[in-house]
């Protein structure tokens, strides 16, 4: 009993410490909540939330599992200097609410494909972090004409 209790307390402390390491920019960032540039697109049965920053060649940023637009707070302004940055809350993440009972990488990659169609973007560059990388890779595999890099 004592070992389990100590193990549980240790796990709580470690997890709490990990979350406290997020830079303040993530906690106080406008990204993911910017009403001036935030929009919803009706994509495959749900409303997909996205924000667009900058001008130039399109670049879509795809966050990882459990993440949101806010996870790219440190990168958006940098890339927006030279690109039209499209940051998206993936299906069932952030402001993109989906109450469906299934979720897959293929499903999410097709969501991004449809969003690009909705935005009339013929091709773009992709940066994906963690599971966002998987989604970007599948998007490139299934729709190679839409992905530059």
Where are these regions (language model features)?
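Active-site loop/oxyanion-hole signature of alpha/beta-hydrolase fold enzymes
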Residues: 87-128
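Conserved hydrolase catalytic core segment
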Residues: 122-149
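Glycine-rich, phosphate-binding/catalytic loops in enzymes
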Residues: 6, 60, 76-80, 102-105, ...
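Conserved HGGG/HGGXW glycine-rich cap/lid loop of the alpha/beta-hydrolase fold
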Residues: 46-95
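Alpha/beta-hydrolase fold catalytic core
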Residues: 2-59, 82-83
């Amino acid at each position: 009993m004592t070992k389990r209790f100590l193990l549980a307390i240790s796990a709580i402390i470690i997890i709490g410490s990990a979350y406290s390491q997020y830079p303040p920019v993530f906690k106080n960032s406008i990204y993911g909540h910017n009403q001036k540039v935030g929009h919803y697109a009706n994509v495959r049965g749900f409303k997909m939330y996205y924000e667009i920053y900058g001008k130039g060649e399109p670049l879509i940023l795809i966050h990882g599992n459990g993440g949101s637009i806010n996870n790219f707070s440190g990168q958006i302004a940098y890339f927006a200097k030279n690109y039209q940055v499209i940051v998206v809350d993936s299906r069932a993440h952030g402001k993109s609410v989906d109450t469906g009972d299934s979720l897959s990488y293929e499903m999410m990659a097709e969501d991004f494909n449809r969003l690009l169609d909705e935005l009339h973007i013929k091709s773009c560059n992709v940066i994906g972090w963690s599971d966002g990388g998987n989604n970007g890779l599948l998007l490139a595999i299934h729709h190679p004409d839409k992905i530059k890099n």
